[in-house]
Amino acid sequence: MAMLGLLLLASWALLGALGLQAEARPAPYGVKLCGREFIRAVIFTCGGSRWRRADILAHESLGDFFADGEANTDHLASELDEAVGSSEWLALTKSPQAFYGGRASWQGSPGVVRGSRDVLAGLSSSCCEWGCSKSQISSLC
């Protein structure tokens, strides 16, 4: 009788451990992300560390930019006059219709923009419904 009780106890412990292991297993498709959580995951995956790195590099490059308190203002004024006279500045001061040749930018080829938008919408809805992996999210980068 003691042997039967010990056998039942061992089988109960084994089944309990298997049940806990099954509950701890992640979903087969990854993590379910909907709405704002999905967008945050895309931003974190695609640009999080890159933006932080760019901020650090910009801070390092500007470190000794303001070290000299007495800047040569005549030199800066001539650079400003040169920039205002450039074709890039003139392009910025034109109206959008003149810059784009009278055609609004959305009237071009919408297939490319719409195609990438459809991929994003499809992945976001499937990620919300079934879940998605980090590699699927990084495919949007």
UniProtKB/Swiss-Prot annotation:
GO terms of molecular function: G protein-coupled receptor binding; hormone activity
Function: May play a role in neuropeptide signaling processes. Ligand for LGR7, relaxin-3 receptor-1 and relaxin-3 receptor-2.
Propeptide segments, given as residue ranges: 54-117
Protein name: Relaxin-3
The entry's keywords: Cleavage on pair of basic residues, Disulfide bond, Hormone, Secreted, Signal
Source species of the chain: Mus musculus (Mouse)
Predominant localisation class: secreted
Record-annotated disulphide pairs: C34-C128, C46-C141, C127-C132
Assembly information from the UniProt record: Heterodimer of a B chain and an A chain linked by two disulfide bonds.
Any matching Pfam family: Insulin
